[in-house]
UniProtKB/Swiss-Prot annotation:
This is Autoinducer-2 kinase. The keyword Kinase applies. It is an enzyme of class 2 (transferase). It comes from Escherichia coli O139:H28 (strain E24377A / ETEC). It catalyses: (S)-4,5-dihydroxypentane-2,3-dione + ATP = (2S)-2-hydroxy-3,4-dioxopentyl phosphate + ADP + H(+). Catalyzes the phosphorylation of autoinducer-2 (AI-2) to phospho-AI-2, which subsequently inactivates the transcriptional regulator LsrR and leads to the transcription of the lsr operon. Phosphorylates the ring-open form of (S)-4,5-dihydroxypentane-2,3-dione (DPD), which is the precursor to all AI-2 signaling molecules, at the C5 position. Keywords: Cytoplasm, Kinase, Transferase. Its EC number is 2.7.1.189. InterPro entries: AI-2_kinase (IPR033676), ATPase_NBD (IPR043129), Carb_kinase_FGGY (IPR000577), FGGY_C (IPR018485), FGGY_Carb_Kinase (IPR050406), FGGY_N (IPR018484). Transmembrane segments: none annotated. Pfam families: FGGY_C, FGGY_N.
Length: 530
């Protein structure tokens, strides 16, 4: 590829659009991976009256917000638009956008849309109850979060939209389309539709045929880091970028986050600690779990896939605990000029490993085929205030998050035979030094903490740089730009103690699931169709 710019031209920058579940960000980086400026706005998804579980994506409003963020980032950086060498977009996975035959976006839903529960159940019965298994073996996805039941819901309930639909993309692709007018999907994000073959990294239209759905709506597939087009004059007026700026194919947020962390080689492993915690392991070739407990997604690195297990609401649970029970600590932390979590970790560091036997019941390990959780609770509390207090419960939550991660990584090892020698811990959770050490002690693995902990936008910027000809390789650039802050080494004695805690927690959790099964308690979350 001919180079449009060279890294020595230090005036040039890269822009990443990061479309998360709750917000949109435009982030500007220099060519050494340093974040220069950001523009950010929260967005809200639309619940449709009388459609339980619906969460539609507001195309018009959210495009306005994206444009405002791009203008804000440029303003905050104090740079002229002509110095943006390229732009790319990443997004939450599973969210889809439909277009009519004139190219106008006509409908979209967010990743959290769960309206199609009945359709999931119907689809599971196809082919003598083997359809979901066929989907999983080919694509690494089950039906619960895939596009197939959502399309079937539209065919049943919004036939006007279904008949008009000419093309389907992901939300990251929609952003690129709004900038360039070019429609395409990339494997890493489109892989979460349950319609993309893991081996070929291309659509598998036979799955739509099997479901009785149209197979003529599938967009061209282009790899992450491919030049898609350029910013149109119309888009330039709205977003502030210069017309003609290269627009590059982006991808899924987790996979691009791994690129930004340098997790680009087979067997490399990461725990991404945000609202949800993802445990991901790179696999050199497609392989799926015979038990269907783990999802498998295309990596942004061609030919590679990622086994991914998800811990539910881990970061959200910590925020709930802080806001519900720690008003005093929030005030003290504010007076001290520190983060509340830092103060809570200092308190929790004085609690012995094992947290006096307290067992939080929140997220289960991932069971992709039958994915649901027990009712939130704390088990084995005591009425001794010296042993059972806020510090103990906070440490117990951190330990439990690490235990669930270790269980998820073990599930991946069981079918992939990949046993990592270390892991990367990133996201907001990795800011906690105690939490990072607990993860090392529970997993028994050295835990490496990067300087840039929110790496999704950086990975997206790397893709933009490859598409613009600035960087020659995504993998090599990811490895070159990542910098490490610290490493946590596991304590063998604590690891042995946590092994016992893990075994007890798994047994107790199974009993708690039984209470949900008997209708006595309410699940933290259930996948559509269960």
């Amino acid at each position: 590829m001919a180079r449009l710019f060279t890294p020595s031209e230090s005036k040039y920058y890269l822009m990443a659009l990061d479309a998360g579940t709750g917000s949109i960000r435009a982030v500007i980086f220099d060519l050494e991976g340093n974040q220069i400026a950001v523009g950010q706005a929260e967005w809200r998804h639309l619940a449709v009256p009388d459609v339980p579980g619906s969460m539609e994506f507001d195309l018009n409003k959210n495009w306005q917000l994206a444009c405002e963020c791009m203008r804000q980032a440029l303003h905050n950086a104090g740079i002229a638009p002509e110095y943006i060498a390229a732009v790319s977009a990443c997004s939450m996975r599973e969210g889809i956008v439909l277009y009519n035959n004139e190219g106008a976006p006509i409908w979209a839903c967010a990743n959290v849309d769960a309206r199609a529960a009945r359709e999931v159940s119907e689809l599971k019965e196809l082919h003598n109850n083997t359809f979901e298994n066929e989907v999983y073996r080919a694509t690494g996805q089950t039906l619960a979060l895939s596009a197939i039941p959502r399309l079937l819901w539209l065919a049943h309930h919004r036939s006007d939209i279904y008949r008009q639909a000419s093309t389907i993309t992901m939300i990251s692709d929609w952003l690129a389309y709004m900038l360039s007018g070019e429609l395409a999907v990339d494997p890493s994000n489109a892989g979460t539709t349950g319609l993309l073959d893991l081996t070929t990294r291309d659509w598998k239209p036979a799955l739509l045929d099997m479901a009785g759905l149209r197979a003529d709506i599938l967009s061209p597939v282009k790899e992450t880091g491919t030049l898609l087009g350029v910013v149109s004059s119309q888009a330039a007026e709205l977003c502030g970028l210069k017309a003609g700026t290269p627009v590059v194919v982006g991808g899924g947020d987790v996979q691009l986050g791994c690129l930004g962390l340098g997790v680009v080689r087979p067997a490399q492993t990461a725990v991404l600690g945000g609202t949800f915690w993802q445990q991901v392991v790179n696999l050199a070739a497609p392989v799926t779990d015979p038990e269907m407990n783990v999802r498998v997604n295309p990596h942004v690195i061609p030919g590679m896939v990622q086994a991914e297990s998800i811990s539910f609401f881990t970061g959200l649970t910590m925020r709930w605990f802080r806001d519900a029970f720690c008003a005093e600590e929030k005030l003290i932390a504010e007076r001290l000029g520190i983060d509340t979590y830092t103060l809570l970790e200092e308190m929790a560091s004085r609690v012995p490993p094992g947290s006096w036997g307290v067992m939080p019941i929140f997220s289960d390990r991932m069971r992709f085929k039958t994915w649901y959780h027990a009712a939130p609770s704390f088990i084995n509390l005591s009425i001794d205030p010296d042993k059972c207090n806020k510090a103990t419960l906070f440490r117990a939550l951190e330990e439990n998050a690490a235990i669930v991660s270790a269980c998820n990584l073990q599930q991946i090892a069981d079918f992939s035979n990949i046993h990592p020698s270390s892991l990367v811990f990133a996201g907001g959770g990795s800011k906690g030094k105690l939490w990072s050490q607990i993860l090392a002690d529970v997993s028994g693995l050295p835990v490496n903490i990067p300087v840039v902990k929110e790496a999704t936008a950086l990975g997206c910027a790397i893709a933009a740089g490859v598409g613009a000809g600035i960087f020659s390789s995504m993998a090599e650039t990811g490895e070159r730009l990542v910098r490490w802050e610290r490493t946590h080494t596991p304590d063998p004695e604590k690891h042995e103690l946590y092994q016992d805690s893990r075994d007890k927690w798994q047994a107790v959790y199974q009993d708690q699931l039984g209470l949900v099964d008997h209708g006595l308690t309410t699940s933290l979350w259930k996948a559509p169709g269960l």
